[in-house]
Amino acid sequence: MKIFTHRSKLMYLAIFLMIFDSFRPLLFSLDTSLYLSIVGRIVYPILLFLFADSFYHATNKKKIMIGLLLLSWLLSLGYGLIDHFIVPIGWQNYENIFMTLLIVAMFNVGTDYLRKYRKQLGRKNYILRFQGIGMILLPFILSFLVFEIGMFFLKPTFSKAIVYYIVGAVMLMLPSLFVVHTGVMMVILGWLFYIFRKRRGIQYLLILVYSIFSFLLHPYSLQWTMVFSIIAIHFCHREKKTWPPV
């Protein structure tokens, strides 16, 4: 289990596999792609777990978030080039792991502000409270903005080409919930990993509960296979390393 003790290597491997998982449907047949998706299902919770621990110890969270935003734009550019020159994807099907981590980071920063507010002694600084709530609500506000822009350009007065490129560009540039990898629930899972960072048993329980519900609701989606990520997470030593790992 030596690989699981090297958090930096595991972090890079998880990111690479998640990017691979994003392009997987374009590279393989439907049957092969379905079975390969198991890798992404298992790696995703591991990445969220490592991100929660690393982000907590990071000294410059703002720099991390800017880096994630730039990486998300770079990945979106890759999607756009493939969509235009190789295989039509459609921006509706884009899944951006870096944008997902950015939104998780926004929730985490909001949580930090609220924790600082709660720990204050004497007169409370309500600015921290508003900053915390604002950071948590910001992804939802931006998602609503993206939705409204999309509805505006869907009017018959605009051509389909304008709608496709403008709405697609806005959706891919702004941190919205429309392009998160595997859905909003995984963002919430990553946020809960951060909240319960020191309670590994609760983290295991979160993965287990999510896997059970996924199996009961959609057994053929293979999302439930993420339960096996608990094995890898169990052998991850809690080393205090910042994000990105060095």
Label each residue range with its predicted role:
Residues 1-246:
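Alpha-helical transmembrane segments and their immediate juxtamembrane cytosolic regions
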